[in-house]
C-alpha cells in the first residue's frame, strides 16, 4: 500500500524539481517587456543616481585620456581642446546603454527567481501529504538495508558533499546562483562560502552520526568508522 502511494509522491517530487525551469522560461518572456517599459520610464523620470553619475564621469575621463593620448601619438594634438571628440560621446552613449541593459537583466532575473521561490514554497506547502508519504517510504527502504550498505551510502553522501574535491563543486554552485540572479561575481564571497560552508556541513553530519545514528544503530556507526578509516 505504501509503495502504491509512493509513486504519486515521487511524480510530485519530479514535478517540483522541474517546476523552476518551466516557471523561469515562462515568466522571463512575460516580465521582460513589462520590466523594460518600467525601467525606461523610471530612467526618464528620475535622473541618474549619484553612483551612476560617478561611474559615467570616470568612464568619460578614461575615454578622454585615451583619446588625447592617441592624438599625442599621432602628433595631431591642439594646444586647446574645446570639446571632446565625437567618438567619446558615442562611446559614452553606448556604455550607458550597456549599463542599463545589465541593470535590466539583474532586475528580470531577480524577479523571476523570487516568483519561482514563492511558487516552489507554495508547492511544498500544498503537497505536504505527498512529501510525508515519500519520506516515510525512503526511510523504510533505508532501514531495510543491511548495515554495510547503509554505511556505504552514508559515506558516499558525506564524501560527495564535504569530501576533498567538494570545494570545487560548492564553488560552481555559488557561481551558478550568482549568474542565475544576475549578480556581479564577487571572489571574496565565493572564497568565504567555499571555506566555511563545507566545514559547517561536515560538523552537522558528524553530529548526526555520533549522536543520532549511534542511538539508532551502534553497529552501523562502527562499520561506518571502519570503512572511513580504511
Swiss-Prot record:
Membrane protein topology class: Multi-pass membrane protein
Membrane-traversing stretches: 7-27, 106-126, 145-165, 181-201
Gene Ontology molecular function terms on file: antiporter activity; proton transmembrane transporter activity
InterPro entries xref list: CemA
Keyword Membrane: yes
Alphabetical UniProt keywords: Antiport, Chloroplast, Hydrogen ion transport, Ion transport, Membrane, Plastid, Plastid inner membrane, Potassium, Potassium transport, Transmembrane, Transmembrane helix, Transport
Annotated compartments: Plastid, Chloroplast inner membrane
Free-text function comment from the UniProt entry: Contributes to K(+)/H(+) antiport activity by supporting proton efflux to control proton extrusion and homeostasis in chloroplasts in a light-dependent manner to modulate photosynthesis. Prevents excessive induction of non-photochemical quenching (NPQ) under continuous-light conditions. Indirectly promotes efficient inorganic carbon uptake into chloroplasts.
Record-linked HAMAP family: CemA_PxcA
Name of the protein in its database record: Potassium/proton antiporter CemA
Lineage summary: Eukaryota, Viridiplantae, Streptophyta, Embryophyta, Tracheophyta
Amino acid at each position: 500500500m505504501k509503495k502504491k502511494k509512493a509513486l504519486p509522491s515521487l511524480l510530485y517530487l519530479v514535478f517540483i524539481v522541474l517546476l523552476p525551469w518551466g516557471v523561469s522560461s515562462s515568466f522571463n518572456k512575460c516580465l521582460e517587456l513589462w520590466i523594460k517599459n518600467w525601467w525606461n520610464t523610471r530612467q526618464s523620470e528620475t535622473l541618474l543616481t549619484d553612483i551612476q553619475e560617478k561611474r559615467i564621469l570616470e568612464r568619460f575621463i578614461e575615454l578622454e585620456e585615451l583619446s588625447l593620448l592617441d592624438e599625442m601619438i599621432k602628433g595631431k594634438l591642439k594646444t586647446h581642446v574645446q570639446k571632446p571628440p565625437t567618438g567619446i560621446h558615442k562611446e559614452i552613449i553606448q556604455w550607458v546603454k550597456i549599463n542599463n541593459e545589465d541593470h535590466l537583466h539583474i532586475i528580470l532575473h531577480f524577479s523571476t527567481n523570487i516568483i519561482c521561490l514563492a511558487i516552489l514554497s507554495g508547492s511544498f506547502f500544498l503537497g505536504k501529504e505527498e512529501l510525508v508519504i515519500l519520506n516515510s517510504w525512503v526511510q523504510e527502504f533505508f532501514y531495510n538495508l543491511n548495515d554495510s550498505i547503509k554505511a556505504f551510502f552514508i559515506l558516499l553522501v558525506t564524501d560527495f558533499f564535504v569530501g576533498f574535491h567538494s570545494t570545487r563543486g560548492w564553488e560552481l554552485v555559488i557561481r551558478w546562483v550568482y549568474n542565475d540572479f544576475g549578480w556581479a561575481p564577487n571572489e571574496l564571497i565565493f572564497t568565504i562560502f567555499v571555506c566555511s560552508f563545507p566545514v559547517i556541513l561536515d560538523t552537522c553530519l558528524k553530529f548526526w552520526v555520533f549522536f543520532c545514528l549511534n542511538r539508532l544503530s551502534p553497529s552501523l556507526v562502527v562499520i561506518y568508522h571502519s570503512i572511513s578509516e580504511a
